[in-house]
């Protein structure tokens, strides 16, 4: 992020036709559902095929459900559900208690089965929903037809201490080095979330800078000019994310996964359901051996030639075709 690019975005935001973007969002049927102690906002795009497979598409941070909709729109052969996690966008946070990954997995599973009535579904998650994705597949194998991952499973820090394979050790050493230089955002969100949120909820420009900086740095674009992010994520989409966070004042509650559990991941058993793993470019050296140990019915493993941290948002057509290929592999299409 640079001051000149931020000024350019702010100026665009001042003149931007939000009503046109709002109309685009509203073309996607949206609902609220009470699931246990949570109220969850979600988009539900039903296929014209009554017997189409169902798909849960979760978002991460710093984005919202809206960034996943270009991907969802390319999947008319699925019933697609795109929820907002509790505390993000139009989903209020849990009334009490921590936002653990196990709790999020139970809420998302309840949405798909108890609320929407799907007997089975595919699941996709990324970033803060990556572990939730794994937990859904591991905890509810009778309901999950398959799991799609672009952020493949990471063993816990305790488990990493026992790794001996050179490529596995080197991968996490590189991540630790990256975190030391680039992970300050996560540390402050995990330790001083309310202080930071007070500032960001008071300044649209500050909020925009905090969000877009991550979208710039984590997308599959060359370093240098931050404007290049718009080749992957258009300016309309960048401003939509900022506008949703601003109007809902949800940046503070979006930090809860960091504050309440990002450094204390829930223990996970290996996943037994069919899995399709697509390694995004920022984790291009992720060892295949890690995926094969955790996803014990790994049908597809590939290293993507394009697409960064926000994979389904950056290369939606690529990932839509990958999903269809996986669904055909397991007999769902």
Name each region found by the language model:
Residues 63, 189-333:
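C-terminal subdomain of alpha/beta-hydrolase-fold enzymes, centered on the catalytic histidine
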Residues 1-46, 246-249, 253-264:
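Non-catalytic accessory segments flanking enzyme active sites
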Residues 98-114:
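Alpha/beta-hydrolase active-site loop
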Residues 20, 66, 85-99, 134, ...:
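Glycine-rich "HGGG/HGxG" loop immediately N-terminal to the catalytic nucleophile
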Residues 58, 82, 123-126, 148-151, ...:
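Short beta-strand segments
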Residues 48-90, 327, 331:
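Conserved HGGG/HGGXW glycine-rich cap/lid loop of the alpha/beta-hydrolase fold
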Residues 77, 115-170:
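Conserved hydrolase catalytic core segment
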């Amino acid at each position: 992020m640079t001051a000149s690019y931020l000024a350019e975005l702010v100026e665009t935001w001042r003149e931007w036709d939000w009503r046109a973007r709002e109309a685009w969002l509203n073309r996607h049927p949206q609902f609220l559902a009470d699931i246990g102690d949570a109220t969850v906002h979600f988009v539900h795009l039903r296929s014209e095929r009554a017997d189409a497979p169902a798909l849960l598409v979760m978002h991460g941070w710093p984005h919202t459900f809206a960034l996943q909709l270009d991907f969802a729109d390319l999947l008319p052969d699925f019933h697609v559900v795109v929820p907002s996690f509790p505390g993000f966008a139009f989903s209020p946070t849990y009334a009490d208690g921590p936002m653990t990954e196990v709790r999020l997995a139970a809420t998302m599973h309840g949405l798909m089965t108890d609320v929407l009535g799907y007997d089975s579904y595919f699941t996709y998650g990324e970033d803060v929903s990556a572990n939730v994705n794994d937990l859904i597949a591991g905890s509810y194998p009778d309901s999950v037809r398959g799991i799609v991952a672009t952020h493949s499973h990471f063993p816990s820090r305790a488990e990493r201490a026992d790794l001996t394979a050179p490529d596995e050790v080197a991968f996490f050493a590189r991540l630790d080095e990256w975190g030391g230089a680039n992970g300050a955002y996560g540390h402050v969100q995990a330790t001083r979330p309310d202080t930071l949120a007070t500032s960001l909820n008071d300044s649209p420009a500050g909020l925009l800078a905090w969000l877009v900086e991550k979208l710039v740095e984590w997308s599959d674009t060359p370093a240098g000019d931050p404007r290049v992010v718009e080749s992957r994520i258009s300016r309309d989409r960048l401003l939509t994310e900022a506008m949703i966070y601003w109007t809902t004042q949800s940046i503070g509650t979006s930090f809860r996964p960091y504050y309440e559990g990002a450094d204390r991941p829930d223990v996970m058993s290996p996943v037994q359901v069919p899995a399709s793993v697509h390694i995004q470019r920022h984790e291009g050296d992720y060892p295949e051996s890690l995926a094969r140990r955790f996803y014990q019915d790994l049908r597809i493993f590939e290293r993507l030639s394009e697409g960064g941290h926000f994979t389904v948002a950056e290369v939606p057509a690529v990932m839509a075709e990958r999903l269809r290929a996986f669904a055909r592999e397991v007999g769902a299409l």
